[in-house]
A protein has these predicted regions:
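N-terminal beta1-alpha1 cap of cysteine-dependent amidohydrolase-like domains
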Residues: 1-180, 187-244
């Protein structure tokens, strides 16, 4: 979690953690400018059925509230977050095994002229994404391009912005964008690299289009921002926030 908070704070974005099993969806919805679904090493095969159900209930509730209220409410999913957005829109768990661990280029789809995200990037940066080991991929699951094409719900809702290759050379979807709503997702981890800050800049510009205000942000900031995470030497790269 710390890497995501540090990533957002680089651009002055304040973070308000939302418990995945909260019942106060309306309260949180009015306090945030958008929803971010982070990656996690606790995938659907590791989480309990109750945890998965609670997470999906909250995601579905926030999504339906944004649709019902007709507000510009950006939603972003990273890795695990992308998988759950696909499950929400596609109606079932359609991801398959696409293991990847390391830095990989991504291939930008041909028809991205209508993409809000891709069109926000300068051409030299798009070249960098395709020609260099530009994105950190760390996942076991993903979704194939074929699945995005054959699932009518996904095909109508999302545009495939980019693809990448897993350890065995199989192609999977690396980035998607809703055709009509501010919903975005990537399978890689832009929060782990400074070179992927343009993705954050884009999402920041999307958040600015929402007018919600959080009256308790100063208090939240005092709790979160200066907080020193507990660091456990036995868990490599593991840093945790604790909330009472």
């Amino acid at each position: 979690m710390k890497s995501y908070i540090d990533w957002f704070e680089q651009r002055g974005i304040r973070v308000l953690p939302i418990p995945f099993d909260t019942q106060d969806h309306e309260v949180y919805f009015q306090m945030v400018n958008g929803l971010f679904l982070p990656g996690t090493d606790r995938g659907p095969d590791r989480a309990s059925a109750a945890q998965n159900e609670a997470f999906m209930h909250s995601l579905r509730t926030f999504y339906e509230m944004s649709m019902r209220k007709g507000e510009y409410f950006p939603i972003w999913g990273t890795c695990f977050g992308m998988e759950r957005l696909i499950e929400l829109i596609g109606g079932s768990r359609t991801w398959k095994s696409f293991p990847a661990d390391g830095l990989f280029p991504i291939r930008i789809s041909r028809d991205t002229t209508c993409s809000r995200m891709i069109q926000s990037f300068p051409l030299p940066y798009l070249d960098y994404l395709e020609q260099e080991k530009s994105t950190l991929q760390y996942h076991e699951y993903g979704i194939s391009v074929e699945e995005m094409k054959t699932n009518p719900l996904l095909r109508r809702y999302f545009s495939v912005l980019a693809t990448s290759l897993d350890k065995s050379g199989k192609e999977y979807v690396a980035a998607i964008e809703s055709k009509h709503y501010p919903v975005y997702a990537v399978q890689f981890h832009p929060e782990q690299q400074r070179s992927t800050l343009p993705f954050l800049d884009f999402f920041r510009s999307e958040l600015k289009m929402n007018s919600h205000r959080c009256p308790m942000l100063p208090r939240v900031g005092k709790v979160i921002s200066p907080h020193k995470c507990a660091h456990y030497e036995g868990l490599k790269h593991q840093m945790c926030y604790f909330f009472s």
